[in-house]
């Protein structure tokens, strides 16, 4: 088994949130075995900017579920959705 790369869209709960701080909190929340390869930002609307981390996880049962759950628990996160998944 190899690894899987997933681009995950993380919507903050406010356009006023400090995205750098949110990015740090997302990195700290990662479950064991997962790592972030990079972040992109996507202007959504009305000043709201989504974070799009590319997360690397082992290819196994559950896939990105543990990462999604961890991100949902981070203060300031409104929603989490997997945008794209592929094997490395």
Swiss-Prot record:
MF terms (GO), sorted A to Z: translation elongation factor activity
Keyword Protein biosynthesis included in the entry's annotation: yes
Keyword Protein biosynthesis: yes
Annotated InterPro entries: eEF-1beta-like_sf, EF1B_bsu/dsu_GNE, Transl_elong_EF1B/ribsomal_bS6, Transl_elong_EF1B_B_arc
SMART domains recorded: EF1_GNE
Keywords noted in UniProt: Elongation factor, Protein biosynthesis
The organism's place on the tree of life at top rank: Archaea
Pfam families per record: EF1_GNE
Signal peptide: none
Family stated for the protein in its record: Belongs to the EF-1-beta/EF-1-delta family.
Function: Promotes the exchange of GDP for GTP in EF-1-alpha/GDP, thus allowing the regeneration of EF-1-alpha/GTP that could then be used to form the ternary complex EF-1-alpha/GTP/AAtRNA.
Protein name listed in UniProt: Elongation factor 1-beta
Record organism: Halorubrum lacusprofundi (strain ATCC 49239 / DSM 5036 / JCM 8891 / ACAM 34)
């Amino acid at each position: 088994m190899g690894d899987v790369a997933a681009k995950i869209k993380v919507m903050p709960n406010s356009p006023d949130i400090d995205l750098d701080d949110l990015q740090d909190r997302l990195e700290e929340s990662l479950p064991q075995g997962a790592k972030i390869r990079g972040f992109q930002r996507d202007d959504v609307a009305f000043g709201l900017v989504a974070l799009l981390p590319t997360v690397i996880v082992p290819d196994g049962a559950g896939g990105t579920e543990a990462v999604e759950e961890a991100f949902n628990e981070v203060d300031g996160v409104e929603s989490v959705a997997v945008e794209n998944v592929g094997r490395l």
